[in-house]
Regions:
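Alpha-helix N-cap/helix-initiation sites
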Residues: 290-293, 498
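Conserved catalytic cores of very large enzyme subunits
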Residues: 1-289, 310, 314-473, 477, ...
Length: 512
């Protein structure tokens, strides 16, 4: 039982395409000889490639359906992310094979998965991440066709999300790698050896197999409201709360110390995370940068509004918000130097905790306009969901905060149905490539099982004031008879949400 998300890379599957190719070439040659046909290389290769393509199709489909039909120990679908990065393999046949697997993954997601009524709908998992890079980002580049396919997929199914190789390499010392699940990023590799006994270890390039020890989140809105707008008091309280978070994180770390590899052999002994001996503890994997531990934060927007009286998109608010972020990073640096553990700052998504935090704030401080008057607080450093701002301005503004959130962060833009405007989707993707490390586009992908309506199912108030979902075509409000897919924070949610998150989804303004 493991908390959080795991990521796999299609680059690790790509080498097996050649294994299958050689197998089919041998089979075809044998079959042609058996029926008296001369097995020329051209004939053998053409038939073998048809079979390879069919196998890629079946293999990708199997991954998709296995992920959505599996259940974790707490009854959830596994939080799996699939990473699609062409430059992870050398140029040539291997990269072309990887491109073929990526292409099929995108085709399968565009198609969707069948529900009980036989209708293709948007699945929540696996989450897909597509890396924007020099040979796929502009028309005329070799893999531009994949980027166009990714844009089509995003417009219909809300994935993939996008990592800019160019920006990530600037921020991560020349490295580009996947996050762990939704948004949690490892620190740049500083390990001093092959601690995990990996069979493919490359010094300075260790990312797969590393992990996170846990996260504790600081509610910045509570710190602000507790200060009574006294700036000196705010910084004093922030340091006190940081110390509380530090002690909680150390408890998480100590809870893992002494854990024998036998508790989860597939993780610790068989190579998913490490290849430790039976009975060996995981302790050495908790230090020297092998794993990370996260200081989370939430509500920077409301914190700034309370302390400065303006949004953090205003110059005065931005200056204060960036100062808060730098203090949080300084704390992580202090703790890292003290313990040789990679503490890192993480933009907490608050999938459902947003409602709990908001209700606690209202109970403690009452309703404060623009601060505690919603049943949610804003995810990490994000611009408030109700604030009018263009997609490009939002991404550019948030990029400076993403740089200060090295342990994890993702930005998004809210867009209408873009299936008939893929040029606009591509324009946003190209802007992401040039300006921000990690971002996504949010659209709507819903289906009513009562009337067959496909479009946006609306959020309305019932007679008691509760937020409910309603089909605009037939008025159906039965959640068991509709399929609703919305971006919760980084993952796509399909199981509906609490009242706080539902209000946040309802109030999102379009950025494009």
């Amino acid at each position: 039982s493991q908390y959080g998300g795991q990521s796999i890379s299609l680059s690790h599957l790509a080498p097996f395409v050649q294994v299958s190719r050689e197998k089919y070439r041998k089979q075809v040659r044998t079959e042609l000889e058996a029926i008296g046909v001369t097995p020329t290389e051209d004939k053998v290769n053409k038939i073998a490639e048809i079979r390879v393509k069919e196998e890629i199709n079946r293999g990708v489909q199997m991954i998709q359906y296995q992920v959505i039909t599996l259940m974790t120990t707490n009854g959830q679908a596994p939080f799996i992310t699939v990473f699609m990065y062409l430059d992870e393999v050398p140029e040539g046949q291997l990269r072309d094979d990887l491109a073929a697997v990526i292409e099929e993954m995108l085709h399968q997601r565009i198609l969707g998965v069948k529900n009980e009524q036989g209708v293709y709908i948007t699945p929540a998992f696996p989450k897909l991440i597509y890396v924007l890079e020099a040979d796929n980002i502009r028309e005329g580049t070799k893999y531009w066709y994949l980027t166009k396919l990714a844009a089509e997929c995003t417009a219909k199914r809300m994935v993939p999300d996008y990592i800019s190789e160019k920006i990530m390499k600037k921020l991560k010392d020349g490295n580009c790698y996947t996050c762990m699940g939704c948004r949690s990023f490892l620190t740049v590799d500083r390990t001093k050896g092959n601690y995990a006994n990996a069979k493919n270890y490359v010094p300075g390039k260790k990312y797969y197999g590393r992990f996170n020890q846990g996260v504790v989140t600081l509610n910045l809105v509570d710190v602000a409201c507790s200060s009574g707008k006294d700036m000196d008091k705010f910084w004093e309280l922030l340091d006190e709360r940081l110390d509380l978070c530090y002690r909680a994180l150390i408890i998480r770390h100590k809870r893992l110390l002494g854990t024998p590899s036998d508790v989860a052999p597939i993780l610790w002994q068989n190579g998913a995370l490490a290849r430790l001996k039976k009975g060996e503890t995981i302790d050495k994997l908790l230090y020297d940068g092998y794993s990370t531990i996260s200081l989370g934060y939430a509500g920077l927007c409301e914190c700034t509004r309370y302390m400065k009286g303006v949004s953090h998109t205003e110059p005065e608010g931005t200056e204060f918000a960036l100062k808060v972020m730098r203090r949080l990073n300084d704390a992580c640096t202090e703790w890292k130097e003290k313990h040789n553990i990679d503490f890192s700052l993480y933009g907490t998504p608050l999938e459902s905790t947003t409602y709990k935090f908001a209700k606690c704030l209202q109970k403690r401080f009452g309703i404060i306009s623009g601060v505690t008057d919603k049943n949610y607080i804003t995810n990490s450093y994000h611009v408030h969901v109700t604030e009018e701002i263009s997609a490009f301005d939002k991404l550019k503004f948030e990029s400076q905060f993403q740089e200060l959130s090295p342990g994890g962060a993702i930005s998004y833009v809210e867009v209408p149905n873009m299936q008939n405007n893929l040029d606009a989707v591509l324009a946003v993707m190209q802007y992401i490539y040039d300006n921000i490390m990690y971002a996504e586009l949010n659209t709507k992908s819903d289906y009513c099982m009562e009337c067959g309506y496909s479009g946006e199912i609306k959020i309305v108030n019932d007679k008691d004031g509760k937020l409910v979902w309603e089909c605009p075509n037939c008025g159906n409000r039965d959640q068991n008879k509709m399929s609703v897919a919305r971006r919760t924070c980084g993952y796509i949610g399909t199981q509906f949400w609490n009242q706080g998150r539902t209000q946040e989804i309802k109030e999102r303004v379009l950025h494009l």
